Amino acid sequence: MELQSALENRKSIRSYLSKDVEPEKLTALIEAASLAPSWKNSQTARYYVIHTPEKLEQIRATLPEFNRKNCEQAPALIITTVVLNRSGYERNGEPTNELGNGWGFYACGLGSM
């Protein structure tokens, strides 16, 4: 698929099949996300695959109703977090500018696309 076509046809999926997803596909998604650019290549995004029914229910219980409803049939969730105080920060621990941790959140969003 050409990049332009992929960008133009991108959409947010809001309903899922309850069919299991092969671990290889989840790994491929995370590997692709890890290629996204980050501030000074700090690579602060972290990805966690949730696939056991008990953990899925625990995570769903924390979501706002709209999000909970959208993912109630999903057989797995990929949870994305950010290591704080690294991306957007200098080695001495001081933020580079007023955005501070915002750089990590920005990079996390890029990987989630």
Annotate each PLM feature.
Residues 1-113:
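Acidic, surface-exposed loops and disordered segments
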